[in-house]
Amino acid sequence: SRIPKTDPQTVTAPTGDIRAVLLHLGRNMWCDYPTEHMGALSPESIETLTMKPRLSIAWSDERWRQVVDYAAAAGINMIVIDLGEGLQYPSHPELAVEGTWSVEKMRAEIKYMNERGIEAIPKLNFSTSHNGWMGDYSHMVSSKPYYRMCEDVIRDVVEIFGGPRFFHIGLDEERAAFQEDQTSQYICARKGEYWWRD
């Protein structure tokens, strides 16, 4: 296997109920959809759905720690971190934006959570409707460079998180209707082919 063997996190895994929250470190999870395909939506919804890439991460260091402390005080024992462009991937530094966390920063935050009884779980969303964080790779779905990038960043994250117990890969809203709906094929098109020809 090309996935590295690592030592598990030093936090004791939750027993009994898992009480978890999802936090988005990156903000470029959504694609820029053409509004003419969205139907009757409110102006606020259209603005959200047609977001341009954001060039900074979602959190200040102070706010992140406040939320982690609040979660611990509320009895949360797991935080799923939607990484996106919020982590500096050693294999793909081109995915970083302003404020992207270094490997050392992420490890320090994982340690901070572990010390408060919170297990850190990584999430990378590979759904074609939430892959804006991939930059140019989001337009290469199902290609060899795309799969190489996916493998690389998964390997990076497994190592950085110290062999997490879980790894969330997103893929919400990934369904057969995207393959059938001609208005959605722009999401999946790559060099004249479509994703279902794998």
Task: Name each model-derived stretch.
Residues R2-D198:
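Feature activates predominantly on carbohydrate-active enzymes
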